[in-house]
Amino acid sequence: MKKLCAIFGGNFDPIHYGHINLAEKLAKDISIKKIILLPNNYPPHRNKTQTSISDKIKMIKLAIHNNPLFEISYLETKKNNIFYTIDTLKKIRKKISHLEPLCFIIGEDNLQTFYLWKNWREILLYSHLLIYPRKHKKQKNDELEKWIHSNTVYDCNLLHKQPCGLIFFSHAPCINISSSRIRKNYFYGKNSHSLLPSIVNNYILLKKLYYTNQ
């Protein structure tokens, strides 16, 4: 059985234990051999923050140092460009064999508005979707719900047996840490050292990140 590679995209502003612990839990439960962290410089469905992409990347590198599970992709880091998942997956598939199983990790909150993503139905042509629990407001979209229902599987081993095309809902613990909360903590002078690796905390303090309201 082939082991999975997985892509975990996000703002990572900053990367924190919620990201890291979730990724390690998914890797253990579903036998993921490699998780590719995909920092977004300018995600289309979120407000842009003031943190530079170079600072985000540096914090990620510090957080995953000497952890062989992780690597970083720079495909969505070009300044002032808007990136779409479907385009990024096409580029990744040019580097990874179309026969190799690949997952794209997203939260249940993002799944609710998945129908707004560019060419959203085509994403399963390039990867599986691996969904992790996240608090969200239910948004009803009949077309999306039908699509999810028709492609969802309940045995994670099936993700290893074909390269793409399936949706799997993980039972990983819900993330109760948010990057926006951490940014606010720093802005108001509150301690966040328990929410992210100490080396990342030290970098934030050294560079005085998040000292202005974002």
UniProtKB/Swiss-Prot annotation:
This is Probable nicotinate-nucleotide adenylyltransferase. It comes from the Bacteria. Belongs to the NadD family. It catalyses: nicotinate beta-D-ribonucleotide + ATP + H(+) = deamido-NAD(+) + diphosphate. It is an enzyme of class 2 (transferase). Keywords: ATP-binding, NAD, Nucleotide-binding, Nucleotidyltransferase, Pyridine nucleotide biosynthesis, Transferase. GO terms for biological process: NAD biosynthetic process. It comes from Buchnera aphidicola subsp. Acyrthosiphon pisum (strain APS) (Acyrthosiphon pisum symbiotic bacterium). Pathway: Cofactor biosynthesis; NAD(+) biosynthesis; deamido-NAD(+) from nicotinate D-ribonucleotide: step 1/1. Catalyzes the reversible adenylation of nicotinate mononucleotide (NaMN) to nicotinic acid adenine dinucleotide (NaAD). Its EC number is 2.7.7.18. GO terms for molecular function: ATP binding; nicotinate-nucleotide adenylyltransferase activity. It holds the Pfam family CTP_transf_like.
